[in-house]
Amino acid sequence: MLDEALLPDGSFHPDWEPWSQVSQEEGSETIHTWEKVVRRLEREMGLTHFQDSTATSLNSPWSVDSVPWILGSDDWALIEKGLEQRVRLMKAIQQDLEGACRLLSERVLPPEIVFLHRGYLPQLHGLEPSPTLNAFDLARGPDGKMWVISHRHDITSGLGFALKNRSILSRALSTPFQRCRVRRLADFFRSWRDTLESCSSRTPRNCRVVFLSSEQRRVKAEDFFLANYLGYTLALPGDLTVRDRQVWLRSLGGLQRVDVLWRTVIGRDLDPLEIAPQPCDEWGLPALFSAIRANQVQVVNPPGSGVLESPAFVPFYRAICQKLLEEDLLLPSAATWWCGEPKALDHVLSNLSTLVIKSAVSRWDNRRQYGAKLSAGELSTLRQQILADPAAYVGQEEVHLSTTPSYRGGALHPAPSGLRTFAHSDLFGNVHVMPGGLGSVISSDGERERECTKDVWVRAEGPLPPHHSLWPSASDESAKTTTSF
């Protein structure tokens, strides 16, 4: 495994040296002290999604590790450029699928990949371009480059936890944070807020943005944290109504018109009048799609963008990038085979015990299976499932994650780690990449479950510009003066 922090001779990577120097200067108990401060701040913020009511320490998948993931400016510049291209590519694909359909008519992309995916919503084709907020899961490949493992375009999660992690570690580790000259996150959120408020025909001052959450969303505290940080109203579908193809927010003062909905409700579940909900669904705003088609409300991300999450796109990205952007793909993806093609199907079935099998029709289907963990009987069952519906499956190379230092049991240990990054586009096609992200420490026992999260520090190449917090409330002076988002 590649080590993000240590060189082959055991010394720290130059990008990690300021963090290492501070830990040595302040004594052997420094990291343990940081750990105690991190746990205290985490309890005070109250955002951690614990798996049970008795969890009090680093045993929740959303707890933050007291050791950050540090990336140098040169390393990040390559990642940033690749992510910027990925966002442009995803927008170009969606515009093509909703317009000229060159990818399908010229057989660059097999039509089954699009039409079988549950995120494909032809009800909303022909709309004006909309801004998007995207997430990309990355892992360090054996060539030392970051590889893209998966995309998130329908709804994204983790942005609030990345913000929480930065709030905690910038305070608990204030000295190494300053020594490392860590790039701030506030400018990214500021540009995202400006983008949302520019979506309305009304002036930004009069534009009403509502953060649409869900009753069943597992980490709803994250939605509350983000809405509070950006100064938006957090609402559930039942708090809204559609009248005369306009969306309104119910309030004690009467109905208030909504211009922009930033959603964390799955696209297929947004409007039960147009797409029949599943029996367990409790969300949805009837007639929302009619308001969208009438250009009376902007919904971000646009419903229908979920189709872009299909891993079946991956084998065709290089050809698609050349066709639509006339560029070479900058960030590689994990090798992937769509079973809807006979040769790819043969390869997957011949290597079933070494591949990761995923659903090609919905990321919400619980079909991800690691062949290396399955028994002979389970592999046989999986083989029959794939043969029964090949187009619904992909096989993907299992990427062995690089390691970062993680504080466990009173000591530092190398832990497999993955990285989720975020980027957004505005109405003018400009792409903004968040200089940081949400790191995940993955269990090394073969279960590949998240053990905790990490703050991701991207080091600045030169002096940092003045920092201005985005906290909207003057009453939260402590957050304004002590956090370094």
Model regions: which residues?
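Preference for protein termini
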Residues: 1-485
